[in-house]
Amino acid sequence: FTNLQKRKFVIYFHNDPLTMSGSVTIKERLFILNFCDKIIFNSEWTRKRFLTNLEKFYQNSEKIQVICQSTTKVKVDLMKKDKIIIFVGKLNKSKGYDIFGKAVIKILKEFKDWKALIVGDEPREKIDFIHKRFIKLGYRSNLDVLNLFKKSSIAVACSRWDEPFGRSSLEASSRGCAVIISNKGGLPETITDGVILNRLNSSNLFNEIKKLIINKKLRQTIQSKSINNFYLDDKYISSKIDIYRNDLFDKKAF
């Protein structure tokens, strides 16, 4: 126990603390607060979930810090964007793939010069959509995904479940996509500009995609703002990590 007292303990929450063994109850979370030197969350949403029903005394603890995921920041020529709607993620109902498919098949029937790219797989669920411009690419490397985002005009992340953060929408925003997301969990924290679906269904998604296709000025405005206002890049997050490390070893926090 003496050796343990000399060490610094940090816990990182990448998912909803209230659904993870060891942090469900108030007692468990108070133990974590008292035992750990730092508690890192990947979004404001996961932080708030951890603090649910805890006394105000703990709300502003210096032990608690949000450090989001990040990606590279690059120059994107919006004039080179293709008429592509892209979906990246597990092809299951939790990710809203069925909602996306129903909406986009209707879009492709109405707008003959647009196509959809689908990146991902899901061996546990079989949700299939067939259209010659509904192109399933399967699993791709992260570099490939970033390049696909770079040439896509519209990206959709329409999860049903409360995403703790949401990497695909973050990366789509960084590459200048007009991003449509569901208002679930930490997804709204992944974009600075875009469309947030407060009512998630295929009809609403269809309408928002159609609006972006028809209104080119609106689409390009969102794309431009996504690029210009994007700040969750590797450099920024690395600086936050440096501050956290210095704080961890320079002083005791509570």
Regions found by a protein language model. Give the residues of each.
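Active-site proximal beta-strand in glycosyltransferases
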Residues: T2-T19, I39-I40
